[in-house]
């Protein structure tokens, strides 16, 4: 039995969970989301808890059992608290600016870089325009969006210029030394 999957997930107050076939729908104070589940796994809602069970004992079903339970837990936590990820922009003249559903970056290229935010994701920049905070109720979409933003200008190892996660440490390299 999956040690993660067998644990029931408690439904917080002000959250509504429904299962429609293979689609789990979650609504809460911060927003709503839905995601599909695999037919090898069944999801039931009863007495303020969500329980996940697998249909057979195959290796694939065992893996999907724990995954589905974690996806349900993340969805419940997301619609109540929400998720956020911080990014830092390092480099001379590097900055970001949020305009509606777009982030405009100045990253040392000959042109500004425009990044369109997906639905359900919001962003804000601090006063210095070097710290970017991305928020969403969907943990997966948040991580994907943060990775795409970081990929616009990944940090380089010599001076550390680029976009990095707030909690990321860049392994620095030493530059060339002159011939003796």
Curated annotation (Swiss-Prot):
Keywords from the UniProt entry: Ribonucleoprotein, Ribosomal protein, RNA-binding, rRNA-binding
Molecular function per GO: rRNA binding; structural constituent of ribosome
GO terms for biological process, alphabetical: cytoplasmic translation
One GO term describing the cellular component: cytosolic large ribosomal subunit
PROSITE patterns: RIBOSOMAL_L6_1
Entry keyword GTP-binding: no
Record flagged with keyword RNA-binding: yes
Family of the protein in this entry: Belongs to the universal ribosomal protein uL6 family.
Function description: This protein binds to the 23S rRNA, and is important in its secondary structure. It is located near the subunit interface in the base of the L7/L12 stalk, and near the tRNA binding site of the peptidyltransferase center.
Entry-linked HAMAP family: Ribosomal_uL6_B (MF_01365_B)
PANTHER family: 60S/50S RIBOSOMAL PROTEIN L6/L9, LARGE RIBOSOMAL SUBUNIT PROTEIN UL6M
Subunit text: Part of the 50S ribosomal subunit.
UniProt-recorded name of the protein: Large ribosomal subunit protein uL6
Annotated organism of origin: Anaeromyxobacter dehalogenans (strain 2CP-1 / ATCC BAA-258)
Gene behind this protein: rplF
């Amino acid at each position: 039995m999956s040690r993660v999957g067998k644990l029931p997930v408690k439904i917080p107050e002000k959250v509504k969970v429904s299962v429609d076939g293979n689609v789990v729908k979650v609504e809460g104070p911060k927003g709503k989301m839905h995601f599909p589940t695999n037919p090898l796994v069944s999801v039931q809602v009863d007495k303020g808890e969500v329980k996940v069970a697998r249909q057979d004992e195959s290796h694939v079903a065992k893996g999907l059992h724990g995954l589905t339970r974690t996806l349900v837990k993340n969805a419940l936590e997301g619609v109540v608290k929400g998720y956020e990820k911080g990014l830092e922009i390092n480099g001379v003249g590097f900055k970001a600016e949020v305009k509606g559903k777009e982030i405009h970056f100045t990253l040392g290229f000959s042109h500004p870089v425009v990044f369109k935010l997906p639905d359900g994701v919001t962003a804000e920049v601090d006063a210095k325009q070097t710290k970017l905070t991305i928020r969403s109720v969907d943990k997966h979409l948040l991580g994907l969006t943060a990775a795409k933003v970081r990929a616009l200008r990944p940090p380089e190892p010599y001076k550390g210029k680029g976009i990095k996660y707030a909690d990321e440490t860049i392994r620095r390299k030493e530059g060339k030394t002159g011939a003796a």
